[in-house]
Regions:
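Short, charge-dense linear interaction motifs
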Residues: 1-95, 99-246
Length: 246
């Protein structure tokens, strides 16, 4: 049951395509001799695994003295950088952002939520770090071991890694070809069932490009989905073709 649920999105798309082909065949049977066309939709689908990982995290320091806060942040930055290098991350894969500074206050409010008084309590300094690498498994493992840094005193906030595919353009072209071939086969079958032959291609239209997690119940989007939270993904695309019939 779980497997059926996981594939429900793809099933819905496939059923819709089959139904549209059925309608196309029936529409052709009742065709107007001055406008003999048939419309079909083909599907291209492929499972693939991400080859690029992006891991974002941040660390903070607080102090009533800005210079002290900077010094503490610098110490943590060096500790984090050395930790990543010791785990085999390349220096060029590590990017630190500029430092963000905010002033902190303790405030009291009146009954109308207007500030009655405020007392300065210090500065909060925050810096982001991003690791981008094609060594997906290595960075995954490092992201799960950040408690080592936290235990050493680095106040690190780790985000979930994001996963990408660097050959997406090539994959999309392959899938368009697959979806076009599928649509043409459906058109030929529909024409054959109606006792006719397929003519020239009149019009083609590409549907939205969907990337979702493999074996998931993730929803399809009319505007297109682009999953970045899963390493293993499934890509889908549709092609709508209109053929002349003779």
């Amino acid at each position: 049951m779980e497997k059926i649920k996981n594939h429900i999105g793809l099933i819905i798309v496939s059923v819709a395509i089959v139904f549209s082909t059925f309608l196309a065949a029936n529409a052709f049977k009742n065709r107007n001799s001055n406008n003999d066309t048939i419309n079909v939709t083909g599907l291209g689908s492929k499972d693939f695994e991400s080859d690029l990982i992006v891991w974002n995290s941040s660390f903070t320091k607080k102090s009533t003295d800005l210079k002290t806060a900077y010094a503490s942040l610098e110490k943590d930055r060096e500790a984090l950088k050395n930790y990543l290098l010791s785990k085999g991350v390349k220096e060029k894969e590590i990017v630190f952002s500029s430092v963000g500074i905010s002033k902190d206050f303790d405030r009291t409010y009146d009954e109308y939520q207007n500030v009655r008084s405020e007392v300065f309590t210090g500065y909060t300094l925050k810096q982001n770090v991003q690791v981008e690498s094609k060594e997906v498994e290595k960075i995954e493992n490092i992201s799960r071991q950040v408690t080592e840094l936290i235990n050493s005193g680095v106040e690190l906030y780790s985000d979930q890694p994001e996963y990408y595919y660097t050959k997406l353009a090539e994959l999309k072209l392959q899938m368009i070809a697959e979806a076009t071939k599928d649509a043409k086969l459906r058109a030929e079958k529909s024409a054959e069932n109606a006792g006719a032959k397929l003519g020239d291609l009149k019009k083609s239209e590409m549907g939205v490009f969907q990337i979702i997690a493999q074996n998931s119940s993730e929803d399809y989007s009319w505007g297109g989905s682009f999953n970045t939270s899963s390493k293993k993904k499934t890509a889908n695309i549709t092609m709508k073709l209109s053929y002349n019939i003779r």
